Amino acid sequence: MNAPSRALLRARVAFVVAAVICAGAPAARAKVTKIVIDRRAPLGATYETLVGRAFGELDPDHPLNAIIQDIQLGKDADGKVHYIASFQIAKPVDLTKASGLLWHDVPNRGGRLTIVQAERDFGDIGLSSAWQGDNSGGTVVPADAASPTPVARPSTNEWLVVPVARNPDGSTVTGRILARVVNHAGTNSAPLLVQANPLPYRPATLDTAQAILTSRVHESMNGVVTGERTIGSADWAWAKCDATHPFPGTPDPTQICLKGGFDPNLLYEVVFTAKDPLVLGVGFAAWRDVGFFFKTAAADDFGTANPLAKANKSGTEVQWSIARGVSQSGNFLRGFLHLGFNQDEARRQVSDGTWPIIAGRRIALNFRWAQPDGVLELYEAGSEGPQWWADYEDRVRGLPRRGILDRCRATGTCPKVIEHFGAAEVWELKLPIEWVGTDAKRDIPIPTNVRRYYIPSTTHGGGGGGFTETPTAPARCPGNTYGGPPDANGAIPPALLAANPVPHTETVNAIRVHFRDWVMNGTLPPQSVYPTLRGLRVEGEDGDDERDEGKDDRDNNQGEGREGHFLVEPTLEAMGFPRGIPGLPAKVPEAAILTSRDGVPLARPIVEVPFINPVLDYDWGPLFNPSDGSGVPTNFPPPVKQVIKTLVPRVDPDGNELGGVPVVLRDAPLGSYFGWNVTVAGFHKDQNCDYVGGVVPFARTRAARLANHDPRLSLEERYGTHAGYVKAVDAAVAKAVAARFLLPEDAQKLHDQADASAVLR
């Protein structure tokens, strides 16, 4: 683990305990006891940012905190569990000009967030606060984290200090875990990474005889492993090595040195006994309490005023709050709601709205040895238990009838929820079980306090937009796993297809306005639009939107005809996927076409099904609770009990997805836009390129199309001239505006961009 050390972390927590006790601060319930503002800085002409730290404590015996894994093993001398969380506030300098709405943003892997200009134009307040306590990569804890006074150079990231679990007798907690090395070449040692950040756990011993290192030639999307062999304990070391310090290198618990070096065509997996698990579930409570403090408290226990408090100290300038998280952070919010954290220990509702963005699962956080940086690669948790909002009995996995909103519904603390996502979340991030469950036999209704918007034919988070006949921006498979070994400059090889440009930006702009109106004024947003088995919207247990809290003074328009909203098997025939698109391997995206094995070209390619990344039902052992994603996993690697059926949206004759919310570039296309791509190098060569989408442009002319045997109509055949294309864009713009998924100012912008483009000029 990155510096500072575990011992230093424990010392910092001890400092907090001593400071609170010496000051005689009350400790009746979980709360923020102290805040320190480290820095103020201007943000434009009328806003400012405040960076600081919040010191908090939790009652481990309170029922709302008891669900935190190992919380009893993280107690300090006063019987409480303590944490330190960084934060940033963005607010009007003149707080009386604030709108009353607080956006509480969840950082992604420590990345600090500042509300955008559109939100500042409304007078909104922004809060970014820490939740991820693994002290790794972007969440590394600074050396001055526990300073009782302002620090000169505060961190630019968000980090959280959480306790290390200790056995009741004070001894070290240990357990078996797993780590992987992928796409590493040469004799230099390999760091153990999760996504692209260091593994947050260290081995209990550097004796390699106490661990098992294996290599493998291949693993399929279904988790089938081939060509596996065990590497002798004398042939590797827990060490850092390079040309100057060859094998066995210098002892280092964070890296593996392999005698003879690493083969980039192999994947390496180590199972070992780790020590000092972090009580990472504290992150749920810390994020809850920091947000609620700034929403409601006048001052901390030491008299430091809440910077959002009213001048007369009669409360704060915050009337409403919306929790928001993107990707990993959106997964955090789904887990946050599922485990009942949208109420504090006094049973008060924390957030009025929750917006998980491009997030289709619950975060892997609240179990021992959790790795929250994971992105659902093989043997990574996150798809266990209910991924759906309403109750559903998971008969396929033998789990009880549950839903994400169970706990908040029982206590009357459920927020309004909007979620949106696109095609990449279907093809790589295992989203479809949220819609149809694990048996894929029926559409799971969504409660009336939830809106779901599917942005079709888009990559993870959307592309860069614009109207370009031949996009050239490369798509790179993310993390350390998929793209292949980096070159001498550290660059990952690009994927087969250029980056999918279809944006989320304009759709998100509209959703933002609708969510504010829903939370602040009770005005209903557009009805949900997403693919279903029946091709129909399924909202509420009885489909009755009239029970929704709020007023609907506009026409709720589905936007896209219902006939397009179908989910089908991920086969070319069922999807209606066109054959013969230039540059695409045959059978993709139904199957991967494997052209090499162990770096050696195959005389005859292998067709491997599926290409999509399915949900794998793992056996994590008897101490793991799959419904809550809590407990202690003991099986490493976990056996795959079964592969869960996966469905995908249908596509049109160009391969673009049908249905979903109207998106201008999808509806006035310049190519085929996919939520998937193909890896071209490294261990996962020829397989799905993680969560990165691609594009295959249309030919410009009919002659060029025929010469390339392209079954798709050319731009010339579709639109005729540049003016014809601008007319098609204007029609798509009008459709999106009518459906309330495009703001008027963005409509004009898109028209102007299309008019100024070089399309068919």
Locations of the language-model features?
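N-terminal secretory signal peptides that target proteins for export/translocation
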Residues: 1-10
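C-terminal His-loop and adjacent cap/lid subdomain of alpha/beta-hydrolase
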Residues: 30-761
